[in-house]
Design a protein with these regions (language model features):
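A short, glycine-/small-residue-rich helix N-cap motif at loop->alpha-helix starts
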Residues: 2-13, 135-136
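Alpha-helical elements of Rossmann-like donor-binding domains used by nucleotide-donor carbohydrate transfer enzymes
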Residues: 7, 11, 39-46, 141-145, ...
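Active-site nucleotide-sugar/metal-binding loop of Leloir-type enzymes
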Residues: 10-23
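Short, high-confidence coil segments that cap the C-terminus of an alpha-helix
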Residues: 21, 51-53, 151
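Short beta-strand-to-loop acidic/aromatic patch adjacent to the donor-nucleotide binding site
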Residues: 21-34
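Short catalytic/ligand-binding loop motif for oxyanion handling, primarily in non-cytosolic enzymes
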Residues: 33-35, 63-69, 162-169
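Conserved catalytic core of nucleotide-sugar-dependent glycosyltransferases
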Residues: 37, 42-127
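C-terminal catalytic/acceptor-binding lobe
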Residues: 128-184
Length: 184
């Protein structure tokens, strides 16, 4: 663990002895991959085919609007989002959020992120000083940085269950980091 998700990811990543092409996965602790292991590995390897792949994830958007909210409803209506995630509501019922088909995207949600060790080293995992919250907006920061470096972020086909809805109620740090991201 650490004092922030940035510190935790950086500390744990640095403990690994990875070759540049090894793939490292960062994910929430409340997800479950429902694909068979062989299907998951096949889809992950397929997503990394091609040159300059940055991050691969389960959900994201082709366009991050001025609000910096990747799941923006207006952009969703325009077909800008990608991915499919099963969630569990407060009553324990499973429902599916279908953002759109797998495609290349600008940014990805941090629910599930995969990247080669080389990409992770290029992007870096340290928290920038201008992000004040310790646990929020790392996903948009990392994946937008990869995009700005000329890498291609992708949503892959993955059957994934998220045991929460990603609730923001009472999470001022998410709103503060979002505003800091917009300002920088």
């Amino acid at each position: 663990g650490g004092d922030s998700i940035f510190e935790t990811y950086e500390t744990e990543f640095n403990k690994l002895e990875l070759k540049d092409t090894d793939v490292c996965i960062f994910c929430h602790d409340d997800i479950h991959i429902l694909d068979t292991p062989s299907a998951f590995v096949w889809n992950l390897k397929t997503a990394f085919m091609g040159e300059d792949v940055g991050f691969v994830g389960a959900a994201g958007t082709k366009y991050l609007g001025e609000t910096a909210i990747w799941w923006d409803m207006e952009l969703w209506k325009m077909g800008m989002h990608s991915g499919r995630v099963k969630h569990i509501d407060p009553e324990g019922k499973t429902y599916i959020t279908d953002y759109g088909p797998p495609m290349n995207v600008a940014v990805l949600d941090g629910l599930f992120l995969a990247a080669t060790a080389n990409t992770i080293r290029d992007v870096g995992l340290s928290k920038p000083d201008w992000l004040t919250g310790a646990w929020d907006f790392y996903d948009i920061y990392y994946t937008s940085k990869a995009l700005m470096q000329g890498k291609v972020n992708k949503v892959m086909k993955v059957d994934i269950l998220h045991r929460s809805r990603g609730e923001l109620v009472g999470r001022m740090s998410w709103h503060e980091n979002r505003q800091a991201f917009i300002n920088n």
